[in-house]
Amino acid sequence: MPDCQNTNLPEIILASASPRRQQILREMGFTFSVCPSQAELHPDGSVAPAKFATLNAETKARDIARNTRQGLIIAADTVVVDTLGILGKPASPEEALNYLLRLGGKSHTVISGICLINTQNGQVRSGTCQSSLHMRPFTPAEAQRYVESGLPMDKAGAYGIQDREFEPVEKIEGCYLNVVGLPACTLVRLMKEMGFCPELHDNWQPEGDCTLCRIYRTGINQTC
């Protein structure tokens, strides 16, 4: 890993419209602009889930990097994986309901791929983070009410771990922020691999020990 000496990051450009990823970056202390990528791959079972998440993040980052000459692009992709395969964002309320009923009362994995591109020198770094979850049992009526709220429609697997009115997750092993969509420890590690030393807000210590993560202890704001 290169020496971590540079605290002066280039302009950060987040290639995502996700309000949850934006909130995580803000709470970590980053200033950034948002330029969502419209490029996206669709899972077809031809590659492993972790590889797919990484490829999708890289696709989004390169899409924005084509028109950017001065900046650090951050792109991410999060997938939910059960025994039948990858669950992305639901395409319809019906699919969201099917996803929820498929996951309820069972265990699954959440994988986030992150890609950083420094457009000033062409540096590219990618990485993944993985968490294991067990969903609580819930009735079809509960799942239907959650779908009707609209909250699941922009989330991989059709649920948000931070949605407190529904609270779908019974147990989590691994990074909470990975499930939300942007694992802080993976992001900081990739920045350090590029030679940057990001200055974080107080109480952020994402060094791989999730118990040190402030949001792990307090939960992300429900409005995100």
Curated annotation (Swiss-Prot):
InterPro entries: ITPase-like_fam (IPR029001), Maf-like (IPR003697). The keyword Magnesium does not apply. The record marks R20, T78, Q162 as: Important for substrate specificity. The active site is at D77 (proton acceptor). Coiled coil: none annotated. This is dTTP/UTP pyrophosphatase. Belongs to the Maf family. YhdE subfamily. Keywords: Cytoplasm, Hydrolase, Nucleotide metabolism. GO terms for biological process: nucleotide metabolic process. Its EC number is 3.6.1.9. Gene3D superfamilies: 3.90.950.10. One of its GO terms (molecular function) is dTTP diphosphatase activity. Nucleoside triphosphate pyrophosphatase that hydrolyzes dTTP and UTP. May have a dual role in cell division arrest and in preventing the incorporation of modified nucleotides into cellular nucleic acids. It is found in: Cytoplasm. The keyword DNA-binding does not apply.
